[in-house]
Amino acid sequence: MTMVYANIFLAFITSLMGLLMYRSHLMSSLLCLEGMMLSLFVMMTVTILNNHFTLASMTPIILLVFAACEAALGLSLLVMVSNTYGTDYVQNLNLLQC
């Protein structure tokens, strides 16, 4: 495993650990998800370029489209929750609370 792959893998693991540890605020969860998507995009792009996979060259762009949709939905949910409750706590998203 080259140093580039190791650094990208460490970036993904760091974002995943941040997502698992800092779950109280929605904004920090969204930032960790964006870090995971960025590291996946870079890993896919480097792998496709190194192995000369011409058929899979559209895959990173499709991943970026899904990441943009995820970011837009997450930010709209953040605005809705912060306008409704005044905070961005993830516990406000629980529908079973009264």
Swiss-Prot record:
GO terms for molecular function: NADH dehydrogenase (ubiquinone) activity. It is found in: Mitochondrion inner membrane. PANTHER family: NADH-UBIQUINONE OXIDOREDUCTASE CHAIN 4L, NADH-UBIQUINONE OXIDOREDUCTASE SUBUNIT ND4L. GO terms for biological process: ATP synthesis coupled electron transport. It comes from the Eukaryota. One of its GO terms (cellular component) is respiratory chain complex I. The gene is MT-ND4L. InterPro entries: NADH_UbQ_OxRdtase_chain4L/K, NUOK/Mnh_C1-like. The keyword Oxidoreductase does not apply. This is NADH-ubiquinone oxidoreductase chain 4L. It catalyses: a ubiquinone + NADH + 5 H(+)(in) = a ubiquinol + NAD(+) + 4 H(+)(out). Core subunit of the mitochondrial membrane respiratory chain NADH dehydrogenase (Complex I) which catalyzes electron transfer from NADH through the respiratory chain, using ubiquinone as an electron acceptor. Part of the enzyme membrane arm which is embedded in the lipid bilayer and involved in proton translocation. Core subunit of respiratory chain NADH dehydrogenase (Complex I) which is composed of 45 different subunits. It is a multi-pass membrane protein. Pfam families: Oxidored_q2. The chain crosses the membrane at residues 1-21, 29-49, 61-81. Belongs to the complex I subunit 4L family. It comes from Leptonychotes weddellii. Keywords: Electron transport, Membrane, Mitochondrion, Mitochondrion inner membrane, NAD, Respiratory chain, Translocase, Transmembrane, Transmembrane helix, Transport, Ubiquinone. Its EC number is 7.1.1.2.
